[in-house]
Amino acid sequence: MLDLLKIYYYLFYRPKIFFPKKSYSLLGEDIFINNYFKNKSKGFYIDVGCYHPLEGSNTHLLYKKGWNGLNFDISDYSIKLFKFLRKRDISIRSGISNYSGKRE
């Protein structure tokens, strides 16, 4: 069991200490957004389909700079993670669509 913990440590925890992530989004979109707003230390974003507060996030880099915003996702699990990890944000479990009405 100890060997598994060592493997986990070296694969997942240690690299984050010595090599911090520069991008949290899937394809570096957050780097583009960060460069576009490089002189703004505070701001407001709306993230529709937010998925996860860290992995694949287009807004986490902005959050680290002091921004806050609204996060929408249909997954209850995702919204619970956002509420736990991003205290300055407002996270809402809801779908966004151009159709009115309630989904079954």
Which sequence ranges carry the predicted segments?
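Phosphate/nucleotide-binding beta-alpha loop and adjacent structural elements of enzyme active sites
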Residues: 1-104
